[in-house]
């Protein structure tokens, strides 16, 4: 169905993109580079598929420049991009830059300054395209001078999804109240979330349904689980910036950090204790499998990335829960929402990424045209519908997006109105090395090989060692 949806969008999209009044400019600008093949690598997500299967084809029809976008797994994408840039081999003309890794890339001077490149090449500046049209998410891809090094192609929040049909079932309501002493409802606290998870696991089993009480992004061999803890579960308990003291770059409590503090340990205990109420695939689930599990009706509730929320709620050929998806902010600990609203914390991760140009690219000018093409306001609405992402301010008011928003229980409205409560990853140039040091401890806690307390004591010590070795600690 995903390919069918994209095919249907192609038939309507191409005409609208070419009718923006600037088709002749694109043809003229692309003429010197006609026949050029741009190689790109990105993660295989719904937004990435739309870019490769729709936008790239329309761009080629206008300019004669072919875009070959290799959408692959997160692991492979990261590995291929960074090896290419480290070796300066020039295999890729553009790469996907995840928000959380951009500081590492900037620190290592991997990327072309797009603002500077366009300023120095006025003939390449597309009419009607302005970097000012983006939401504030573009700020994550700027350096200290405000220059842009990546053009955002996806941005979304991680929301709480729940099954309306299960939560509204009369027998479920009666049984829950009898068992727990209060009314069944989507969770606004962790205690309620845990009760819901326990209840629906038994309710589904008693009614012969293949469903459980919650999703868990708990892969024991993939960084997705570490990210889930550091960027979703932890912040909702009040653990920010990985528990790192941003003045001293220490993460252990005894040195002024918080990674093994009370909030962190409460968060990891809560999360690992959900595993008995999660589908069997939980310990092999990344963000993709979580989306698939929820869409298959295998969970009553869960933290789910927005790139999946829209199709889960609207794509009847791919999702078994269309018409029954509720969307809310995730539960938070007392005080967290206040801290987030005042800018002193955040409730979860504002995820997304951008396309950037490596210094090693052999086709920088042609790639500048491609990145501006995907930055047009005119292409954003269909892209948002296909991938649950919004990078431009005007997209929220597009009639097509508003129609899908209604079907998706107000997901886009929620992102627009509460996105300020979320935040991107902390600005750590050592992001990859630091997260890698934490990974084995999160895996061990999920696998039951270490207690959450011991795992976080080990994780903070390992992270502190990385920061010390790299010279960050005072």
Task: Specify the residue positions occupied by each region the protein language model found.
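Short, polar/charged alpha-helical segment
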Residues: 23-29, 46-66, 161, 165, ...
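Glycine-centered hinge/linker elements that transmit conformational signals in sensory
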Residues: 192-201, 235-284, 326
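Long, aromatic- and glycine/proline-rich binding clefts that accommodate carbohydrate-like moieties
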Residues: 23-26, 34-37, 43, 325-335, ...
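Extracytoplasmic/periplasmic substrate-recognition and gating elements
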Residues: 146, 166, 273-279, 317-390, ...
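Short helix-initiation/N-cap motifs at beta->coil->alpha
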Residues: 72-80, 188-192, 282-296
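Extracytoplasmic "Venus flytrap"/periplasmic binding protein-like
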Residues: 54-133, 147, 169-170, 175, ...
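Hinge/lid segment of periplasmic solute-binding proteins
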Residues: 20-32, 99-159, 229, 326-331, ...
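Short, low-complexity disordered leader/linker segments with a strong preference
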Residues: 1-38, 61, 464-474
